[in-house]
Curated annotation (Swiss-Prot):
Heterotetramer, composed of two GyrA and two GyrB chains. In the heterotetramer, GyrA contains the active site tyrosine that forms a transient covalent intermediate with DNA, while GyrB binds cofactors and catalyzes ATP hydrolysis. This is DNA gyrase subunit B. The record marks K453, N456 as: Interaction with DNA. It comes from Bacillus subtilis (strain 168). Its EC number is 5.6.2.2. Mg(2+) 2 binds at D501, D503. Residues 422-536 form the Toprim domain. Mg(2+) 1 binds at E428, D501.
Length: 638
């Protein structure tokens, strides 16, 4: 963390516009007013403290969920300026807390780089809180001011003397705005806190839950920064080279940090950040890194004779197989684009990342020939598998061209050709598949029965995956292609429903299918196309009356409502095959009465770790997970 000019005072605070609009249209400022928006408030305040840390003035940040679900954030930075603001005639801290776009981030003299737009954060949080209290330790005095829904209810008061500096912000989210929930999720906050600690080398971040019955505390501090992050992400994988490669450089005011390490898996995980903001959609910095990596590895392999003269170069996918990498850049003027504004658009970031990374990576490969050879060998194996997969794909295409219909024989397709209303049910077992085919609405519902369990794609390369019949049937039915051939626009169905039995085998098949979709068709999950059917667990019959219960709690409630006599008959479904076509339609497939769970992707890093832990080669992480969670099991299927 570097020291910068210590001229962070009231004159650096620029004012752009008023606050009234925030309460009317909160979604424009924090994305939404659901749980996501609620948690966003915390980051708006924490980002201010992180900016102080990046500038070299803050070493400790403390986040507390109070007993009443309010939030307190404490840092030991310089303290928000308290002098009178020249243009506004009010204390600078009040301007920051009550005026939108007032902050020390706009003309570059307060901070070189910053994450969220400073001051947008504080004032928006203030506007969306029933109460906000700010305490500033600065210039030997303790200053305090209180606000209600964005309006100051006290002047800035001096309440004591101090021998240190820093800012404490306490806020209570407004239930009128956050009508869905004002309940904070500790794990969600702790995950992001850990990420921020990795990205801000050396800073000490503590998070504490003070709510009754939920008390816990975590402290995060990583001297290794993103190098430690890569080690953390690879902790349950077999690594190809012991030490992660770490590269840092600066050019034209842009700082680039890259850490990478190869493991023995078949997928790559690259996470990129700009000013600590996760650029989920990638961008120019990520593109520069990928270009540089492919070029450096191919150049090295040719110089050392590991790729023969007439052989083609390794592709980008080849050199990235089994790669875990973090790219973190600090940019004074980042331009974000893409659907969710999480894609970096600055063209200079591509060139600078490529140049700085390539130079250092070349040096690493020359100085570490053993690790370099292992990296090249992994790429060569990936290339061979890619060629085999290409042949398998071509074979599939050739077969398709020779057949009258190129759709799998067991697929009962729907008559509609409109993907936006079409649904594909992937059903466990032929018997349930038969009932589903009879019970469905043929106009928009297609059925694809699966025989047995599909291949665990976490442990296999693409060539092996493509030789598996069940996987091939799914790929052909969905129409999107997979991997580098994937094209979402070719999807034949906008609802893909996984329908399996409610037992352990059904859960296993569901996990295998989700692993396949996540690894090779991630966009169908990201775009909300994947659903899980909820077949009932019980059938309750009393005379001619038939009711269904989807879990034990529902069954309990249902039995309470029924008369004592005659005694109701109870059937627990062991599998989908026990239901006839009509029952399956009424309970699980009829859009007017069914329950579907949509599969969403909140945190790619978390999802990746979960699939690796559940489906990967290492047994130890799975055993640890089972030991830690065994006490929560309600239904044990032995």
């Amino acid at each position: 963390m570097e020291q910068q000019q210590n001229s962070y005072d009231e004159n650096q605070i620029q004012v752009l516009e008023g606050l009234e609009a925030v309460r009317k249209r909160p979604g424009m400022y924090i994305g939404s007013t659901n749980s996501k928006g609620l948690h966003h408030l915390v980051w708006e305040i924490v980002d201010n403290s992180i900016d102080e840390a990046l500038a070299g003035y803050c070493t400790d940040i403390n986040i507390q969920i109070e007993k009443d679900n309010s939030i307190t954030v404490v840092d030991n930075g310089r303290g928000i300026p308290v002098g009178i603001h020249e243009k506004m005639g009010r204390p600078a801290v009040e301007v920051i807390m009550t005026v939108l776009h007032a902050g020390g981030k706009f003309d570059g003299s307060g901070y070189k780089v910053s994450g969220g737009l400073h001051g947008v954060g504080a004032s928006v949080v203030n506007a969306l809180s029933t109460e906000l209290d700010v305490t500033v330790h600065r210039d030997g005095k303790i200053h305090r001011q209180t606000y209600k829904r964005g309006v100051p209810v006290t002047d800035l008061e001096i309440i004591g003397e101090t021998d240190h500096t820093g800012t404490t912000t306490h806020f209570v989210p407004d239930p009128e705005i956050f009508s869905e929930t004002t309940e904070y999720d500790y794990d969600l906050l702790a995950n992001r806190v850990r990420e921020l600690a990795f990205l801000t080398k050396g800073v000490n971040i503590t998070i504490e839950d003070k709510r009754e019955g939920q008390e816990r505390k975590n402290e995060y501090h990583y001297e290794g920064g993103i190098k430690s992050y890569v080690e953390y992400l690879n902790r349950s994988k077999e690594v190809v080279h012991e030490e992660p490669i770490y590269i840092e450089g600066e050019k034209d005011g842009i700082t680039v940090e890259v850490a990478l390490q190869y493991n023995d898996s078949y997928t790559s995980n690259i996470y990129s950040f700009t000013n600590n903001i996760n650029t989920y959609e990638g961008g120019t910095h990520e593109a520069g890194f990928k270009t540089g990596l492919t070029r450096v590895i191919n150049d090295y392999a040719r110089k050392k004779g590991l790729i023969k003269e007439n052989d083609p170069n390794l592709s980008g996918d080849d050199v990235r197989e089994g790669l875990t990498a973090i790219i973190s850049i600090k940019h004074p003027d980042p331009q974000f684009e893409g659907q969710t504004k999480t894609k970096l658009g600055n063209s200079e970031a591509r060139t600078i990342t490529d140049t700085l990374f390539s130079t250092a990576m070349e040096t690493f490969m020359l100085e570490n020939p053993d690790a370099a050879k292992k990296i090249v060998d992994k790429g060569l194996m990936a290339a061979r598998a890619r060629m085999a997969a290409k042949k398998a794909r071509e074979l599939t295409r050739r077969k398709s061209a020779l057949e009258i219909s190129n759709l799998p024989g067991k697929l009962a397709d729907c008559s509609s050709k409109d993907p936006s209303i079409s649904e594909l049910y992937i059903v466990e077992g032929d018997s349930a598949g038969g009932s589903a085919k009879q019970g469905r609405d043929r106009h928009f519902q297609a059925i694809l029965p699966l025989r047995g369990k599909i291949l665990n794609v976490e442990k296999a390369r693409l060539d092996k995956i493509l030789s598996n019949n069940e996987v091939r049937s799914m790929i052909t039915a969905l129409g999107t292609g997979i991997g580098e051939d994937f094209n979402l626009e070719k999807a034949r169905y906008h609802k893909v429903v996984i329908m399996t039995d409610a037992d352990v085998d059904g859960a296993h098949i569901r996990t295998l299918l989700l692993t396949f979709f996540y690894r090779y068709m991630r966009q169908i999950i990201e775009n909300g196309y994947v659903y899980i059917a909820q077949p009932p667990l019980y059938k309750v019959q009393q005379g001619k009356r038939v009711e269904y219960a989807y879990n034990d709690k529902e069954l309990e409630e249902l039995l309470k409502t029924l008369p004592q006599t005659p005694k109701p008959g109870l059937q627990r479904y062991k599998g989908l095959g026990e239901m006839n076509a009509t029952q399956l339609w009424e309970t699980t497939m009829d859009p007017s009465s069914r329950t579907l769970l949509q599969v969403t992707l909140e945190d790619a890093m978390d999802a990746d770790e979960t699939f690796e832990m559940l489906m990967g080669d290492k047994v130890e992480p799975r055993r640890n997970f089972i030991e830690a969670n065994a006490r929560y099991v309600k239904n044990l299927d032995i």
